[in-house]
Amino acid sequence: MLYFDWFDLPVSLYPDTSLLKQRFLSKSKLFHPDKFTLASEEEQAKALESSGFNNQAYKVLSDVDARIQYILDEYGLLKDDKEAMPPDFLMKMMVFNEAISDLEDDPSSFSTLQNDLVEWEHELKAELDYCASLLPLDKENARQLKTYFFKRKYYLRIQDNFSKFAQP
């Protein structure tokens, strides 16, 4: 069963979070293991399984990155964990990595690089918003979402490197 189906929500990059939480809490009460202490072992096991599924579904759908990965996986698009990235994007990565390593020698560029990362994050958000408008996914739209997903992974890695090496 799809996590979205579990909560009776449409597949979306931006599900209604208040409705998601409400349905999660409702199912949490319904399948709480304490309610099944006097039930048969089979019913207890089923309640425990349902409770675990409920928790996992909520955890995934509550986090945008996990949700995107889940959607792509459900569409069968992450079987090949490699994505050919556009050359201009790879060049951008190289420039960011070089700029981060240069911070040790030239800390004055910290704020410029920080601003560039914020701008990049805004670009990624706009790209995600565009991808959200494409659901349900066809082959071309799915490819765009997959490209976004891998760009986001690169971005998070760059941001992590920046935070490690770039203390003002």
Which residues does each predicted region cover?
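C-terminal accessory/regulatory regions appended to core domains
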Residues: M1-P168
